[in-house]
Amino acid sequence: MKEALSSLPLTDAELVSQVKARLYPLTPFTQFLEWLIERLPRKRVAVRLTPQANVAEIDEMAGEYKAISEEPSFQVEIDPLFAKGGWFYLEAALVRHTGDREARFFGKGGRDRRSAFEIPIPSNLRGTVREVFYLPGPVSSLSWAPMHAPGFFSQSCLLVHRISAAESFLRRAHRVVLTLISMRGSRGEARHGLTWQGAAVKLQAAYLQTAQLQIQRYRGHDYAEFIARHDAIKPSELEAMTASIQAAEAQPLISLIMQVRDPQPTFFSEMLGSIRSQSYRHWELVLSMDESVSADCRQVLKAAQREDSRIVVVETHDLTCKAAGLNALLRQIRGDFFAVVSQHDLLPKHALLCIASAVQSQPNAVVVYGDHDCMDANGLRYAPHFKPDWNPDFFTAFDYMANLRLWHTAAVRRLGGFRLGFDEAECYDLTLRCMASCGQEQILHVPRVLYHQRDLKGANAGSPVSMHEPQGGDAGLLALSDHFRESGATVVAGAMPGLYRVRHPVPSPVPLVSIIIPTRDKVDILKACVESIQHGTDYAAWEMLIVDNGSVEPQTLAWLEQIQKDVRIRVISYPGPFNYSAINNFAVQQANGEVVVLLNNDIEVISRDWLTEMVGHALRPEIGAVGAKLLYPNDMVQHAGVALGIGGVAGHVHRYLGGTEPGYYFRAIATQNYSVVTAACLAVRKAVYEEVGELDAVNLKVAFNDVDFCLKLLKAGYRNVFTPHALLYHHESLSRGHDDTPEKKAIFEQEFGYMKTFWGQISDPAYNPNLSLEFEDFSLRRF
């Protein structure tokens, strides 16, 4: 019988150490509690797994597999301790690359030995499993299902102990209490029936409910639940915002302009009602309409005008030129700021109050925008677009602002208003011109849903990507080309309609680039990396510094000697313990290039223009680090930007997404600014690298050094950028945990703690606060 990794002959101590090293670290206090609880009587259970026909082995020693069907499973050999049934505690590292995280045990047992049972096993974002479960003895069969979908996954040995009733009670009670505390103020439905009273009476039922709550997060977050818990502004907050605005010397007048053409009476009336019910009272609505407007709609509008003098109607006979019509309205308004709204869309009651509050905090604002969602004909809200704070590189790849978007009226009039010739891209063109004439701090983002985009066709219900159907692609391309006319950048259509690719110029002759590759033995991996650069890169002026950190294998040493026949390649020695930061700093000091590229030795080139693309960005004066799009060998995303806060410090967004999939509102296929990009493939000007103090070789020898470096670049005033157009493979093991030995785990915990202490809680301008810090897929914040 061929057995999985868990059957390898390890001692108890070795197995425990191996598994625990891969688990997400506990807090010091929880670690102390864990030490106390483990003093209670317990016995380790030998877990031997045999993969079934629906599981294909990739690397058995590393615990890597591929699920061929939606029901991948392993048969569990029935150890005598399992056969008895009772309470057990499972610890394991389980990484699934499909987004599905629904693991479970299932089998048969009980008095008749034939009663089927199924036990859900949740995990956290990092794939750490720490779960108490009960087996109804005697157990006659048992299987382990790591997920409920086809795709790649990896797992450690399953570390299982048969535990006492006391340990079971303490562990279950601890999680139930923590969950209840975290859910204070949540609706009853959001709790899945979990209450303090219920937990006191039926602890096991409450514990299973906490497992279901965790699994529910994996299945996708319910936007209706999110709305109920996070959408409304508390009365006290509303009162404070209102009082603050009223205390100011002047309250900004907000003008809403609208071109009305053949509206549906019901939705048109709802739109008017949503504006008239605004908590903020200093607004005006200026509309233009033509003969297509029905008598019913005219009656609705007249009634609204009689009741509200803030509504102004301008009759027109031609709405065929949108820009001309908008300019006619622009001449009529009195507001300090204005927005273009559509005839069927809605504004939540707090929308203009939030805008006024934002403007009060930054009186010099030129552009202000909020988040938005979609609404069907029945008023159902879905497909929220939670946007980043001002993200100039993303905006020049995609008009992500959409609605609600406001401009400073005087600034727009100085620019000449809306330009003709940019049909369906009038707002994009206007914002690009504002962007060119104002400072970064003058473009504000309010991270709340302030606009409901009506979707009467139901076209957007299936996918968040389709929620914003890009329009005016050619006009947008024209506007963007005009924006970059003086810089010399060229603009071409992007991967999907409405997306754009900006190619920033590289001077001639091209500057020298120094590619730095730390390595130790593993010559096959290094050779593939180097040869892919030699033969798969169209950028001519590069040198390579291979930094040998103590290779001893004869074949590696021979290859390192031979590869230097290529005059572009040097091998330099850095002996001593592994210190990623020190190794790279040492190499940068010896680099001759204007631009340096930090590169892992397990990278392989996909796109020939990867280096040209990265250098074009790196040479921009305002840019610090440039990150590439990295794929696993199975073409799933390994790196497409890093968001702060995910998993405690930072996490790779869109990890395990299909390599060509657009991601959350195109963010996996569009150039954009991220606070952090990975140093597995990172380009930066050498002078900038040295300016911010290099990588931290004292506090961050192994992990988080790229996060720290990128944050130092931000602090120095640079922007970091991710480009999907520099595409490479990263042959990082799919099963790679943070650390796989006690020594590495200790280093990780020290460096994790340093980042938390030194940088603290940093909000990420590239990642909306309404999005999850548990998951990397842009799912919604839950608690």
What positions do the PLM features span?
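A recurrent flexible, glycine/aromatic-enriched loop bordering the glycosyltransferase active site
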Residues: 323, 381-410, 581-583, 589, ...
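Short aromatic/hydrophobic "clamp" motif used to bind/position activated sugar donors
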Residues: 338, 596
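Short, acidic, metal-binding catalytic loop of nucleotide-sugar glycosyltransferases
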Residues: 272-282, 361, 531-541
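Conserved donor NDP-sugar-binding/catalytic core segment of glycosyltransferases
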Residues: 346, 350-382, 440, 456, ...
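C-terminal, non-catalytic tails of nucleotide-sugar-dependent glycosyltransferases
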Residues: 2, 184, 188-249, 468-510, ...
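Glycine-rich, basic loop-to-helix element that forms the pyrophosphate-binding segment
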Residues: 316-333, 574-591
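Cell-envelope/extracellular polymer assembly enzymes that use nucleotide-activated donors
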Residues: 252-257, 284, 429, 511-516, ...
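A short, conserved alpha-helix in the catalytic core of glycosyltransferases
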Residues: 411, 421-449, 480, 610-614, ...
